[in-house]
Amino acid sequence: MEMLQGLLLWLLLNVGGVWASRGPLRPLCRPINATLAAENEACPVCVTFTTTICAGYCPSMVRVLPAILPPMPQPVCTYHELHFASIRLPGCPPGVDPMVSFPVALSCRCGPCRLSNSDCGGPRAQPLACDRPPLPGLLFL
């Protein structure tokens, strides 16, 4: 009887783990469209634009006994292939570079967070907050 209970518990945990990691409520790491903002302190406006970023769920594990073993690295959804695009901020005074470059995700992967091409800080309360008045309506993909 104990063996049957152990087998049932093992089955439930494994099936539940597979369901949770592949469930419809957790979209996997992939490129998605996002609206971002760009500004320069010397220019009079903030420009919003649409680009492709990496977002989604990456399977991860947490140690049961964290005090005994070091923490496991947690993968994040990050760029696999990308190219850079640029926009020009209007109204910048002479001598100020009006160009702002940004990454455009072509494909994504789960891996370690690299500060050289990713923001590893997590979600922001106001990702589009600008200090300058907005100039909406630009679309870049």
From Swiss-Prot:
One GO cellular component term: extracellular space
Disulphide bond pairs: C29-C77, C43-C92, C46-C130, C54-C108, C58-C110, C113-C120
Glycosylation site list: N33
Keyword Glycoprotein: yes
Localisation: Secreted
Pfam family, one: Cys_knot
UniProt keyword Metal-binding present: no
GO biological process entries: G protein-coupled receptor signaling pathway
InterPro entries: Cystine-knot_cytokine, Glyco_hormone_CN, Gonadotropin_bsu, Gonadotropin_bsu_CS
UniProt entry keywords in alphabetical sequence: Disulfide bond, Glycoprotein, Hormone, Secreted, Signal
SUPFAM superfamilies: Cystine-knot cytokines
PROSITE patterns: GLYCO_HORMONE_BETA_1, GLYCO_HORMONE_BETA_2
Molecular function GO terms recorded: hormone activity
Stored PANTHER family: GLYCOPROTEIN HORMONE BETA CHAIN (PTHR11515), LUTROPIN SUBUNIT BETA (PTHR11515:SF11)
Physiological role: Promotes spermatogenesis and ovulation by stimulating the testes and ovaries to synthesize steroids.
Family: Belongs to the glycoprotein hormones subunit beta family.
Subunit structure: Heterodimer of a common alpha chain and a unique beta chain which confers biological specificity to thyrotropin, lutropin, follitropin and gonadotropin.
Protein name, as recorded: Lutropin subunit beta
Source organism of this protein record: Ailurus fulgens
Encoding gene per record: LHB
